[in-house]
């Protein structure tokens, strides 16, 4: 598809969304792919923001979000294939971020506790965008080599201690360039993007800073994660945070 046709295709679908119409999975895929390929030059950031804001305003559908995640997981992702020397399932402990309470990165500590208790844990993440501290920030402060790209050392840590940290940046190069650090509002990928990991896990504990647990659970099923726990915590004032709450209401879905 030539560049001019890509622009016309994108504008046509953006107008559909602005009118309140839903996109098909393939249409959502193509639009995000064009954005990640930087097809619109200096206007790319504006197009990206308009596209995400328009979809979020009308309420994103499962088809649309799945199409967007197809780009992230199947087009942009450069997977890290590791050799496991254990039979237990590999669990990802992840959070959506963008919560209202502004806690420190609790899920990072939870992942260490999970591994210490005998679980096999992958913790993926990035630097903070809206929270007090991102996963990468926390582990860097604890002395971990967050930029380690040595596959053998990663495998040794995972097989010896049952824990591996995976900063997302090296494994999603196009997302790193066109997306990271630019979106501070809830958008269509907020419901599911944290499953994007260099190392694919078998099970998921997903902390969500909204009440859309059913939507996230259905998206996890669509993307092949059929053994997952989605949790949405609240504080005593009803504010959302992406953790299991012991200070207010907790909504969860398995």
Residue ranges of model-derived segments:
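Acidic, glycine/proline-rich low-complexity segments that act as flexible tails and inter-domain linkers
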Residues: 1-102, 117, 240
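Glycine-rich anion-binding loops and their surrounding alpha/beta cores
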Residues: 2-16, 23, 74-77, 81-82, ...
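Catalytic-loop motifs flanking and including active-site residues across diverse enzymes
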Residues: 47, 106-110, 212
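Short beta-strands and strand-loop turn motifs
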Residues: 48-50, 93, 123, 167-168, ...
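A generic, well-ordered mixed alpha/beta core segment in the N-terminal half of proteins
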Residues: 92-157
């Amino acid at each position: 598809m030539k560049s001019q046709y890509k622009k016309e295709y994108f504008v046509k679908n953006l107008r559909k969304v602005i009118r309140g119409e839903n996109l098909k999975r393939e249409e959502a895929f193509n639009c995000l792919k064009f954005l990640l390929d930087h097809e619109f030059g200096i206007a790319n950031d504006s197009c990206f923001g308009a596209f995400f804001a328009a979809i979020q305003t009308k309420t994103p559908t499962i088809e649309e979000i799945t199409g967007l995640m197809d780009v992230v997981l199947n087009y942009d992702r450069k997977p890290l294939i590791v050799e496991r020397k254990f039979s237990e399932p590999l669990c990802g402990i992840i959070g959506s971020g963008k919560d209202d309470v502004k806690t420190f990165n609790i899920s990072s500590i939870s992942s260490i506790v999970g591994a210490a208790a005998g679980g096999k844990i992958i913790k993926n993440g990035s630097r903070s965008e809206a929270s007090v501290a991102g996963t990468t920030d926390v582990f860097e402060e604890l002395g971990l080599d967050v930029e380690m790209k040595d596959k053998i050392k990663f495998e040794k840590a995972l097989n010896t201690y049952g824990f591996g940290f995976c900063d997302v940046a090296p494994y999603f190069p196009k997302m790193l360039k066109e997306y990271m650090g630019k979106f501070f509002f809830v958008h269509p990928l907020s419901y599911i993007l944290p499953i994007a990991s260099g190392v694919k896990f078998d099970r998921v504990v997903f902390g969500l800073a909204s009440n859309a647990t059913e939507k996230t659970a259905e998206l996890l099923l669509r993307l092949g994660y059929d053994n997952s726990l989605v949790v949405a915590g609240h504080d005593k004032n009803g504010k959302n945070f992406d953790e299991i709450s012991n200070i207010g209401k907790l909504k969860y879905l398995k």
